[in-house]
């Protein structure tokens, strides 16, 4: 019996070693447009990089503060030729066209996975893919909490650019808020770029001066906006990462990423030898709260029990897949019907990734 046990243990060890050997060693390269400690977009991706780097057989390299210019092309080439990267994650929106598309053609054996871009079959190289999370689900919940908290009925949203992902966040936040208070408004200011701290502070103060009492945003680093809200004695909802430490009184909740789960999924597929080129890795990967791509920050001390109840109910619906944010009739803020009555657009519907409008209740323009 002892000999049999020893034999069984030995066989298990051999199988484990064989499985480990079968998993390919990979080098994953991560590129950020801003600093890794920005309390926001880049910090969230850097945290994901740290998470995946703990997996066996995974080596990671990274470079921060790489502008959306030809500079990112040089960074990508260096990671491939010097560091031996076999997969790259250029994380900023502006890296995609033309930079990723150009370099991907030059290195057909390297996988290029872009955060937020769209892959079009036949138009884009086969070794290019796109991943993103339905973080507008968390924004919808933030809208519920913000509406419960607001006394003026005026919410503020500071955003970088009116691209589809940003518009979707603004609209979902507004639709969530209007489930609580149907006449509440969300005033939007676009700063023009992802990291404009002076303009972000000016925009925050301007909105507060106009009666806004809850602020949120879609910029690379929400820190300035959240801090300004705290200094002015109003409330805020965070974005990308948890900013509660810079606003202990007024931070309500926030929409956060969990990139570790996403990057770990890619690492597993790549170690199995799968590629974008042969269909082993999907060209478009999306997920929300249910899939663990995004989450909601813990509630702050100013959040009421009523707000928690409604927010938790919506969270449960996202988790079980029954929540549909975009169901008609929905009008834009010019009065035009953009989603007819009886129409439901589920999160994975590609129509939502082409969003070019602001919903009713938003004060602002995409032009």
Which residues does each predicted region cover?
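Bacterial N-terminal signal peptides
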Residues: 9-18
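Bacterial N-terminal signal peptides that target proteins for export
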Residues: 1-8
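A residue-level marker of the well-folded mature domains of exported/periplasmic proteins
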Residues: 23-367
């Amino acid at each position: 019996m002892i000999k049999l046990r020893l034999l069984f243990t030995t066989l298990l060890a051999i199988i484990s070693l064989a499985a480990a050997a079968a998993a390919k060693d990979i080098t994953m390269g991560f590129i950020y447009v801003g600093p890794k400690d920005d309390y926001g977009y880049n910090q969230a991706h850097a945290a994901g990089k740290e998470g995946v780097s703990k997996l066996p057989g995974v080596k990671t390299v990274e470079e921060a503060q790489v502008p959306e210019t030809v500079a990112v092309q040089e960074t990508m080439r260096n990671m491939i030729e010097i560091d031996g990267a076999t997969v790259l994650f250029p994380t900023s929106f502006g890296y995609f066209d033309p930079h990723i598309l150009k370099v991907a053609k030059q290195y057909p054996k390297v996988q290029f996975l872009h955060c937020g871009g769209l892959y079009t079959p036949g138009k884009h190289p086969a070794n290019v893919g796109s991943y993103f999370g339905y973080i507008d689900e968390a924004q919808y919940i933030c809208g519920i909490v913000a509406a419960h908290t607001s006394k003026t009925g005026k919410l503020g949203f500071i955003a970088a650019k009116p691209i589809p992902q940003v518009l979707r966040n603004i609209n979902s936040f507004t639709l969530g808020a209007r489930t609580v208070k149907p006449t509440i408004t969300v005033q939007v200011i676009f700063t023009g770029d992802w990291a404009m701290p002076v303009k972000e502070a000016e925009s925050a103060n301007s909105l507060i001066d106009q009666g806004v009492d809850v602020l949120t945003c879609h910029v690379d680093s929400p820190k300035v906006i959240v801090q300004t809200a705290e200094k002015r004695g109003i409330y805020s909802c965070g974005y990308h990462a948890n900013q509660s430490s810079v606003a202990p009184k007024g931070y309500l909740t926030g929409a956060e990423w969990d990139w570790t789960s996403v990057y770990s999924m890619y690492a597993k597929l790549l170690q199995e030898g799968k590629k974008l080129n042969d269909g082993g890795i999907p060209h478009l990967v999306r997920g929300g709260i249910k899939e663990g791509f995004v989450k909601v920050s813990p509630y702050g001390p100013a959040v009421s029990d009523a707000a928690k109840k409604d927010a938790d109910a919506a969270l449960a619906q996202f988790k079980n897949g029954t929540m549909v944010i975009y169901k008609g009739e929905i009008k834009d803020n010019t009065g035009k019907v953009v989603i007819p009555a009886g129409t439901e657009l589920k999160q994975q519907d590609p129509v939502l990734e082409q969003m070019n409008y602001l919903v009713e209740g938003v004060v602002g323009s995409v032009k």
